[in-house]
Amino acid sequence: MSNQKNNIPRATLKRLPLYYRLVNQLHEKGIDRVNSKTISEALDIDSASIRRDFSYFGELGKKGYGYNVESLLEFFKSKISESDTIKIGLVGVGNLGKALLSYNFSIHDEMVITEAFDIRDDIVGTKVGKVIVNKMEDLQSILKSAELDVVILTTPGSAAQEAADQIVDSGVKGILNFTPTRINVPDDVSVHQIDLGIELQSLLFFMNNLRNSN
């Protein structure tokens, strides 16, 4: 499976959470079957791309029948994590970190932040949301024992690489990086970079382009 996963286009991997969320919604509504046309209309993704995306993972559906919703849901769950609940750590309890801890993926039953870390004495030991903030000195030992799936990085940019090094040394294989710093990690560690400033600028460019085209 590892070789197969490495050959899956990045664009396909980025669409998987969209498919998963939709399938989960269909399952909650009691719908037991869905076809690519319905998925296409719900997500504004063309049917050919959906069928191609799904083809990377083998036979997920049957011609003339479509896809079994419950089977798709279990499939996507297995691709996200081997466990029922995805445990997440957070490093850097500033304004953004506190907001994420307070939110704590409340609409996603399968994801929860269980550990948080900071260097400031006035933050360490406090409770944000339902999570008690640990000191950075304990990061590696706690991450190793807690067996977290991923860590969210919300430190100042100047502290990002050092924090990332400690996260990697603890055995975590996924980092969601909210800092403006591009961190260096080994090839077997996945990093998803989220720069809110860049995202906003991108939105403004799209808006301006749309205005000009009209």
Swiss-Prot record:
What is known about its subunit structure?
Answer: Homodimer.
Q: Which organism is it from?
A: Staphylococcus carnosus (strain TM300)
Repressor recorded as keyword: yes
Assigned keywords, A-Z = Cytoplasm, DNA-binding, NAD, Repressor, Transcription, Transcription regulation
The record ties this protein, via HAMAP family, to: Rex
Check the record and name the Pfam families matching this protein. Answer: CoA_binding, Put_DNA-bind_N
Per its UniProt record, what InterPro entries does this chain match? CoA-bd (IPR003781), NAD(P)-bd_dom_sf (IPR036291), Rex_DNA-bd_C_dom (IPR009718), Tscrpt_rep_Rex (IPR022876), WH-like_DNA-bd_sf (IPR036388), WH_DNA-bd_sf (IPR036390)
GO annotation (BP), single = response to redox state
Gene Ontology MF term list: DNA binding; DNA-binding transcription factor activity
Where's it found, cell-wise?
Cytoplasm
Task: Answer yes or no on keyword NAD.
Answer: yes
Q: Which residues cross the membrane?
A: none
GO CC annotations? cytoplasm
Q: What is this protein called?
A: Redox-sensing transcriptional repressor Rex
Its function, per the record, reads: Modulates transcription in response to changes in cellular NADH/NAD(+) redox state.
Which positions are annotated as binding NAD(+)?
G92, V93, G94, N95, L96, G97
